[in-house]
């Protein structure tokens, strides 16, 4: 079975309450070992059930850059199954599935570049996106795409294109991986990211097996926390007693 890898920031908000429910939700998907790439494990994690990878980000590295380096590390270190499952701490599997997926949906990368440029100006993340777009085009892909993914992401580690790297970075390695391995990407489906009560109702009504919380601190206010408490009242093997 495929191993699961979480790439976690440190510290986690609210001592990792979202991660706890994400781990409990893994019972709905067949999987191998669970790896966590992070400087420190939360103190409530059972260290005997989780493989801890002490990947230390550069001091003061921004979140996107830290995650990019972890993706690059994923493609160069053979410590887990080659076919792995990428998880974030706010991905929840709310009903049984046979495997992770589908692969992420997308929008053109230039849309994201324009959004960040308008919002932040000429900052490092914008330059990294521009570098990423340039590199993808140099590889013969006319319209670089940006993955939109808020559910378990199947990834073949040996297909992460670390050989693409030149000396003109930094890059977003998650975007590079997506473009390298998706010659015929899927169409955009409904969103499953919850930001408020009404969206939560719509997601549940569609019968999606996955849920994800927003990045704006509305985890409790959205009603998702209360729902997960009802769905997963019992601790998983990955939590201390």
Predicted regions and their residues:
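A conserved donor-nucleotide-binding helix/loop in the catalytic core
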Residues: 16-25, 56-87
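Non-transmembrane alpha-helical segments in soluble domains
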Residues: 23, 27, 92, 174-178
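Conserved donor-nucleotide/metal-binding helix-loop-beta segment in metal-dependent transferases, i.e.
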Residues: 94-128
